């Protein structure tokens, strides 16, 4: 940051992740050093269902995220229904432990190292004013910013020998001739679909949404009367909104997200000097 301050990153994980136990230990001062990441800030994206299991002193199931990708795409009752369905699915890889044992490990690590940070997925999404255009997947390093984000993904375009074209999401299943189901991103020019030979496979990257913080503070040591606050706050809000339009953006997708959401935050500082 301007060559004077190191950057920092917070990594969020949901408590059903198979690697959650190792993740919690990332900043521990003891143990095997190669399994530590002291410059990262681990954080948990906790669901209501997990806390319910803790209160009930019941069991909690851990999954491989590759097998349950949609758990990260939902919250609330939808998450609960899918999670329980995966628990009952005998074909899914899983580990089971007491929810309270995992919670005790979280709290022990928190008191020892100050991490992981704790944020609550369902609470954040229930209060999301932009729930109609997406959902919140994590917070930031300071755990006060909650914005919609989306990962990058790819569209797969198959052009066949007869000149026809079909487009798929990369995870879509396609039954190729021979009866084998392949993900769209695994189909090649050696395959045929519905009797049509694939000629060209093209991959198009679709940018996701990256949250941007547009922040400022009012210095209460200088601005502290009712008249001053009523005068300065509207100006500060307009200034922050102007910054969105005038700012330099290192990535195209960052600019697109900021222009779309126009999220701003105005805080205060200098209370001790009032």
Regions found by a protein language model. Give the residues of each.
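Active-site cavity-forming subdomains of large catalytic enzyme subunits
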Residues: 1-166, 172, 197-207, 211-217, ...
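Core structural elements
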Residues: 16, 237-246, 257-274
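Hydrophobic face of alpha-helices
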Residues: 103, 230-233, 237, 268
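Acidic, low-complexity, intrinsically disordered interaction modules
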Residues: 171, 175-179, 183
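Extracellular interaction modules
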Residues: 188-197
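Amphipathic, non-membrane alpha-helical segments in soluble helical-bundle scaffolds
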Residues: 205, 226-233, 257-264
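Alpha-helical support elements that line or immediately flank enzyme active sites
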Residues: 217-233, 274
């Amino acid at each position: 940051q301007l060559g004077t301050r190191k950057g920092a990153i917070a990594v969020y994980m949901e408590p059903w992740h198979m690697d959650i136990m190792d993740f919690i230990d990332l900043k521990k001062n003891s143990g095997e050093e190669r399994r530590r990441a002291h410059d990262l800030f681990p954080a948990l994206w906790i669901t209501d269902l997990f806390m319910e299991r803790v209160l009930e002193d019941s069991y909690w199931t851990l999954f491989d995220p590759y097998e349950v990708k949609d758990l990260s795409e939902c919250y609330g009752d939808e998450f609960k229904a899918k999670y329980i369905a995966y628990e009952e699915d005998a074909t899914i890889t899983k580990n089971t432990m007491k929810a309270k044992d995992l919670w005790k490990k979280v709290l022990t690590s928190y008191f020892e190292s100050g991490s992981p940070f704790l944020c609550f997925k369902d609470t954040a999404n229930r209060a999301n004013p932009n729930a109609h255009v997406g959902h919140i997947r994590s917070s930031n390093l300071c755990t006060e910013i909650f914005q919609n984000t989306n990962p990058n993904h790819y569209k797969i375009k198959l052009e066949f020998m007869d000149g026809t074209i079909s487009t798929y999401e990369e995870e879509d299943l396609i039954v190729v001739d021979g009866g084998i189901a392949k993900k769209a991103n695994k189909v090649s020019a050696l395959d045929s679909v519905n009797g049509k030979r694939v000629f060209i496979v093209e991959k198009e990257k679709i940018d996701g949404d990256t949250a941007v913080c547009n922040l400022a503070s009012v210095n209460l040591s200088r601005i502290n009367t009712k008249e001053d606050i009523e005068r300065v706050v509207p100006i500060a809000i307009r200034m922050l909104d102007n910054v969105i339009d005038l700012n330099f953006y290192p990535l195209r997708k960052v600019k697109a997200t900021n222009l779309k959401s126009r999220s701003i935050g105005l805080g205060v500082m200098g209370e001790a000097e009032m």
